[in-house]
Regions:
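Catalytic alpha/beta core of large soluble enzyme barrels
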Residues: 2-29, 33-34, 119-288, 301
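Glycine-centered small-residue hotspots that permit tight backbone geometry or close packing
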Residues: 54-59, 103, 137, 188
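Conserved active-site and cofactor/substrate-binding residues in soluble primary-metabolism enzymes
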Residues: 48-58, 74, 78, 82, ...
Length: 302
C-alpha cells in the first residue's frame, strides 16, 4: 500500500510517461515536472530515485502495560528487540518481493530492493489519540489521566489498562470516581495510591517518573533495525524553586548524565520535555491559567 501511495505522489508531481527511463540527470528531470507542482521538484526527484519509506511504530508503552511489563527492565528490552526484529524482517521481505514485481529503486540498482530506506520512528501523538488513546510512537504515557480539549469540547481520558486494574480491586462506583479524581489532582501519577502494589506502580509510571536512561537504552537497542532516524523525546521534572540547592545540582547532573549517555548511544534526540504537554486538570483547585499550546513538527507528525 505504501508503495502505491509513493507512486501516486510521483505520478502527480511529474510526467513519468514522458520522462521514460529512470534518469539521474536532475536538469532533465525538471523538464517533466507537472504545472503547478514546481515546489515538489526536489522531493519528487528523491522519491523517484530512492522510493524511501518510513515505517514506524505506535503504542509501545500501551502494549507493555497491557502485558503488565514495566517500561524499566529487561522484559521491556526483550519485547523491544523482538518487535523491531520482526518489523524489519517483514519489511525487508516485502521490499524484495515488490522489487521482483515492479522493479528496483534506481539509486540502489542491483540490490534487489524496491525501497532504499524502510524504517523511521516518527512522532504520532495525533494518531495515537485517534486510535483509542494509545501511547504515541515509542514514547511512554505522559499521564494516566488527562483532559483532552477539542473544538467540540473537553473530555477526560483515562488509561484503560489502569482502569481495568482499578476495577479488579473491588471498588464501589463512588470510590473509583474518587481514585480518578486523586490521580487527576496528582498530574496523572499513581505512585501515591495505597490501593496499588509496588509492581503495579512500576507498570503505570508516567514519562516524567521513569529513569530516562531506559528511553535512551530502548532507542539504542532498536536503532540497529531503523535505517533512518528515531524521534526520541526525553522527559524531566524541574525541581521547585524552593527546593534546596543540592536538589537542583542533582537534577542538573541527572540531565547531563542522560544526555551524555544519549550522545554515546544515539545519533539524534528530539524534544526535551520539562513540563507536561497536556496538563492534568485538578478538579479540586481553581487556578487561573494561560493557554500554552504544545507545538509539534507537523511535517513529521504521524
Amino acid at each position: 500500500m505504501l508503495d502505491n501511495v509513493l507512486q501516486h505522489y510521483i505520478d502527480n508531481a511529474i510526467d513519468t510517461t514522458q520522462l521514460g527511463e529512470y534518469s539521474a540527470n536532475f536538469k532533465r528531470f525538471q523538464k517533466y515536472v507537472r504545472k503547478g507542482k514546481e515546489g515538489y521538484t526536489k522531493s519528487a526527484y528523491s522519491a523517484y530515485r530512492e522510493r524511501s519509506l518510513g515505517l514506524g511504530a505506535m503504542g509501545f508503552h500501551a502494549y507493555l502495560q497491557s502485558r503488565k511489563i514495566p517500561f524499566e527492565g529487561i522484559y521491556a528490552t526483550g519485547f523491544n528487540h523482538k518487535a523491531f526484529t520482526f518489523i524489519k524482517s517483514r519489511a525487508t521481505q516485502a521490499t524484495k518481493e515488490l522489487a521482483s514485481e515492479r522493479g528496483e529503486a534506481p539509486d540502489i540498482h542491483g540490490s534487489g530492493k524496491r525501497n532504499a530506506n524502510l524504517m523511521a520512528i516518527a512522532p504520532n501523538a495525533s494518531s495515537g489519540i485517534i486510535c483509542s488513546g494509545t501511547s504515541p510512537s515509542i514514547e511512554p504515557y505522559r499521564a494516566n489521566c488527562y483532559t483532552h480539549k477539542t473544538l467540540s469540547g473537553s473530555y477526560q481520558v483515562k488509561n484503560k489498562y489502569l482502569e481495568k486494574v482499578l476495577k479488579s480491586k473491588g471498588l464501589k462506583v463512588k470510590e473509583l470516581e474518587d481514585v480518578w479524581k486523586d490521580i487527576s489532582g496528582s498530574e496523572g501519577s499513581v505512585q501515591h495510591l495505597d490501593i496499588l502494589d509496588d509492581k503495579e506502580k512500576e507498570i503505570f509510571k508516567t514519562a516524567n517518573e521513569l529513569n530516562q536512561i531506559w528511553i535512551v537504552e530502548h532507542a539504542h537497542q532498536r536503532q540497529q533495525f531503523v535505517c533512518q532516524a528515531q524521534s526520541v523525546n526525553l522527559f524531566f521534572t524541574l525541581p521547585k524553586a524552593t527546593e534546596p540547592q543540592k536538589t537542583h545540582d542533582e537534577y542538573m547532573q541527572y540531565v547531563n548524565d542522560v544526555h551524555w549517555y544519549g550522545m554515546k548511544k544515539l545519533k539524534s534526540l528530539y524534544y526535551f520535555r520539562s513540563n507536561a504537554a497536556r496538563s492534568v486538570e485538578n478538579v479540586n483547585v481553581k487556578v487561573p491559567r494561560i493557554n500554552l499550546e504544545d507545538t509539534e513538527c507537523i511535517a513529521c507528525e504521524g
